[in-house]
């Protein structure tokens, strides 16, 4: 991804750094409208996920995470921007006339061919079961449940690694550092998700952040005591607690929040970093 810097004519362009322009011209049969309700509220109207609301209207692109067009070669026709994720998407024209969107693999260009199946080449963008991949393969869009579609390593720049195969399971090292067991029959896509340099982007101004549906973040230490455990005090005061707390009084910043005795604990060999 090429980072573009604007001329320093205004404060927003002086501080902004965006990626190259990738146009979005979605097909009508692969998009549908969605009503973004809630804005971080639950059924009672209470904020459960903060700093959400507003944002530009979006059309959802239907992405083929299952890759169930077996043994039919497809050609990459376009590489498009998707407002619903930080990775780019590719429009694929298959040999039988089917047209679908997939996540853009890093390095894929218009005109490349891809295929899904059991006995397909180990090349970028191809989808096949883990049992048919050699050890050390870089993969993304990984299934957890067979036939449900890819659920792991789908963000921009994400990549997992196949490190072992034993019995009915394969061992993967995920982008978070977690080492996990997954069925060898589950599908995954070879390669890394594109748009690797997305973390180098700088929006440059608060308005660009609002377009993404993200509202301003206020520190708890500048609030009143009624609003946050860190609030109150005369002037600039410390938080007055042994450790940082959430707005609801629970430990924050480093406290493990995963529930104990989950069914999936048996598949996790090493927790994420």
UniProtKB/Swiss-Prot annotation:
Disulfide-bonded cysteines: none
The protein's name: Large ribosomal subunit protein uL2c
NCBIfam families: rplB_bact (TIGR01171)
Subunit structure, as described in the record: Part of the 50S ribosomal subunit.
Principal subcellular localisation of the protein: plastid
Domain of life of the source: Eukaryota
Keyword Membrane: no
Listed Basic and acidic residues bias regions: 264-273
An annotated GO BP: mitochondrial translation
GO CC list: chloroplast; mitochondrial large ribosomal subunit
Assigned protein family: Belongs to the universal ribosomal protein uL2 family.
Region (Disordered): 1-21, 224-273
Places the protein is found: Plastid, Chloroplast
Source organism phylogeny: Eukaryota, Viridiplantae, Streptophyta, Embryophyta, Tracheophyta
């Amino acid at each position: 991804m090429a980072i573009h810097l604007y001329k320093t004519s205004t404060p927003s362009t002086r501080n902004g750094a965006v990626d190259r322009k990738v146009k979005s011209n979605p097909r009508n049969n692969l998009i549908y409208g969605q009503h973004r309700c809630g804005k971080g509220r639950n059924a009672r109207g209470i904020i459960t996920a903060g700093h959400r609301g507003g944002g530009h209207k979006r059309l959802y692109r239907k992405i083929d995470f299952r890759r169930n067009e077996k043994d039919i070669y497809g050609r990459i026709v376009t590489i498009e921007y998707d407002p619903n994720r930080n990775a780019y998407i590719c429009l694929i024209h298959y040999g039988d006339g089917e047209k679908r969107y997939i996540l853009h693999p890093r390095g894929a260009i218009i005109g490349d061919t891809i295929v899904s199946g059991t006995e397909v080449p180990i090349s970028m963008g191809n989808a096949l079961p883990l049992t048919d991949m050699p050890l050390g393969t870089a993969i993304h869009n990984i299934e957890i449940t067979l036939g449900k579609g890819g659920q792991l390593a789908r963000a921009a720049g994400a990549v997992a690694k196949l490190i072992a195969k034993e019995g009915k399971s394969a061992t993967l090292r995920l982008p978070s550092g977690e080492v996990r067991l997954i069925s060898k029959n589950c599908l995954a896509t070879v390669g890394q998700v594109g748009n690797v340099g997305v973390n180098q982007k700088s929006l440059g101004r608060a308005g660009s952040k609002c377009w993404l549906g993200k509202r301003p973040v206020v520190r708890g230490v500048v609030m009143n005591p009624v609003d946050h455990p860190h609030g109150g005090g005369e002037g600039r005061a410390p938080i007055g607690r042994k450790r940082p707390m959430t707005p609801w009084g629970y430990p924050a910043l480093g406290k493990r929040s995963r529930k104990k005795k989950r069914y999936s604990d048996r598949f996790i060999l090493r927790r994420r970093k």
